[in-house]
């Protein structure tokens, strides 16, 4: 079983063609810059969306190595921060499994009380 980051956005209007193009260019840039892009998943936005969403997606995290896991979490939270800022008119939700990320000072952060315990529980799932 894996652990994933889930992300979604809602707003009252659909994305314009210009917004879609700009957003997709940023997604491609972020995916290409991910240091483990050949070994792990990158940003994956779903083509079929749930009602009311303008974006939905997920990225499976690499669980084999704790250092790579932590680096990946940091990278994807920063990447999602950039995407959130690029579509600031949308309401975003970011979770790692059932743990919500918090939007603090223009960036997504995880605020676990006991990060090592959380990592250990993810390792058990692998």
What kind of region is each of these model predictions?
Residues 1-27:
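Short, extreme N-terminal segment that most often corresponds to the first beta-strand
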Residues 30, 41-126:
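Charged interaction segments
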């Amino acid at each position: 079983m894996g652990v994933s980051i889930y992300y979604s956005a809602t707003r009252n209007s659909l994305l314009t063609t210009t917004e879609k193009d700009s957003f997709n260019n940023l997604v491609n840039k972020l995916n290409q810059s991910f240091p483990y892009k050949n070994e792990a998943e990158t940003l994956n936005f779903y083509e079929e969306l749930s009602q009311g969403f303008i974006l939905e997606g997920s990225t499976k995290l690499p669980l084999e190595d704790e250092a790579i896991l932590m680096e990946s979490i940091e990278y994807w939270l920063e990447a999602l921060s950039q995407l959130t800022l690029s579509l600031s008119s949308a309401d975003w939700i970011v979770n790692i499994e059932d743990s919500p990320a918090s939007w603090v000072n223009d960036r997504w952060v995880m605020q676990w009380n006991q990060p090592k315990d959380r990592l250990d529980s993810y390792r058990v799932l692998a």
